[in-house]
């Protein structure tokens, strides 16, 4: 069994974003049923429905745990069903929530070496006592059997793999700070119980041949849904960057996500990490209908999928 809960479906800033007065965010603040609020992207995954691994620790993690009964303490005065946290990158939106988990509660922190190096370089993350929260490096393309803090097998195996992306904004440097790289700075995560296969790829700058081959025939894929069009933030007057500058491919258009997945025979396709400028967030938008007609679902906080 692969049991997944969407803790947060939106991109950085959430929906509505705290400083956005754009029409969609105003609709969300007004509790428009077609524009429900969403917190910042994160999922929880379990092999038994009892012990969970959080994938990406968003700034909203405390609220996300509170809204998710499966992650509530169950035993004694202090406990947690969260056995570990897995990071797919070192962006502010994926690591900040780690500080919420600093209450001397054992769990395992897993990430690729470049991401662990970013954490090591910032002493604030030493608030997570390494004797209680060990940091475990993940090697690209090497299966890793998840285990509970006591060593008991968790029933899931993950395989991290590089996808095209960029370094976090705060780590940009050099002559081409926005260069798209495929070196482990940004990863996707394959998850399997030995029978079913699911993938979590919240950030991806472009589709590649090897990535197409990897995803073909998958049972479930959560994929980067940041922007509907590459220049939507520029056209809306709410930002100065394109999707490519931020390391995200667009959902629509030639070479976009819908186009790239058209012949991959993925059983269930779900968009996640959706920016507040993306009309996909609006249930009554034409763009939402286009995505649905192409076989895509739009994730929402609390969405639960069991394969």
Curated annotation (Swiss-Prot):
CDD domains: PQQB-like_MBL-fold. The keyword Membrane does not apply. It comes from the Bacteria. Gene3D superfamilies: Ribonuclease Z/Hydroxyacylglutathione hydrolase-like (3.60.15.10). The keyword Cytoplasm does not apply. Pfam families: Lactamase_B_2. One of its GO terms (biological process) is pyrroloquinoline quinone biosynthetic process. Keywords: PQQ biosynthesis, Transport. Pathway: Cofactor biosynthesis; pyrroloquinoline quinone biosynthesis. Belongs to the PqqB family. May be involved in the transport of PQQ or its precursor to the periplasm. HAMAP family: PQQ_syn_PqqB. This is Coenzyme PQQ synthesis protein B. It comes from Gluconacetobacter diazotrophicus (strain ATCC 49037 / DSM 5601 / CCUG 37298 / CIP 103539 / LMG 7603 / PAl5). The lineage of its organism: Bacteria, Pseudomonadati, Pseudomonadota, Alphaproteobacteria, Acetobacterales. The gene is pqqB.
């Amino acid at each position: 069994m692969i049991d997944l809960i969407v803790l947060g479906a939106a991109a950085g800033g959430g929906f509505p974003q705290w400083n956005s007065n754009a029409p969609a965010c105003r609709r969300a603040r007004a509790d428009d049923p077609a524009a429900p609020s969403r917190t910042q992207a994160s999922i929880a995954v379990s092999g038994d429905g009892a012990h969970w691994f959080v994938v990406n620790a968003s700034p909203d993690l405390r609220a996300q745990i509170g809204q998710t009964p499966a992650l509530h303490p169950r035993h004694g005065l202090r406990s947690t069903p969260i056995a570990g946290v897995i990071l797919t990158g070192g962006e502010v939106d994926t690591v900040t929530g780690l500080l919420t988990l600093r209450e001397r509660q054992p769990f395992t922190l897993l990430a690729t070496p470049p991401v662990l190096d970013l954490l090591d370089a910032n002493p604030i993350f030493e608030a997570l006592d390494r004797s209680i929260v060990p940091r475990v490096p993940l090697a690209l393309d090497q299966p890793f059997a998840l285990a509970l803090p006591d060593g008991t097998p968790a029933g899931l195996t993950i395989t991290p793999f590089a996808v095209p992306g960029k370094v976090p904004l705060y780590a940009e440097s050099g002559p081409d700070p926005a260069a798209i790289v495929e070196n482990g700075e940004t990863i996707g995560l394959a998850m399997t119980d030995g029978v079913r296969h699911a993938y979590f790829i919240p950030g991806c700058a472009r589709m590649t041949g090897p990535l197409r081959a990897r995803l073909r025939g998958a049972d479930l894929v959560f994929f980067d849904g940041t922007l509907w069009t590459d220049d939507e933030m520029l056209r809306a007057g709410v930002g100065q960057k394109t999707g490519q500058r931020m390391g995200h491919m667009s959902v629509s258009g030639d070479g976009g996500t819908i186009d790239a997945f058209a012949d991959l025979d993925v059983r269930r396709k779900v968009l996640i990490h959706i920016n507040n400028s993306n009309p996909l967030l609006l249930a009554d938008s034409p763009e939402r209908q286009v995505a649905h007609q192409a076989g895509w679902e739009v994730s929402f906080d609390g969405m639960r999928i069991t394969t």
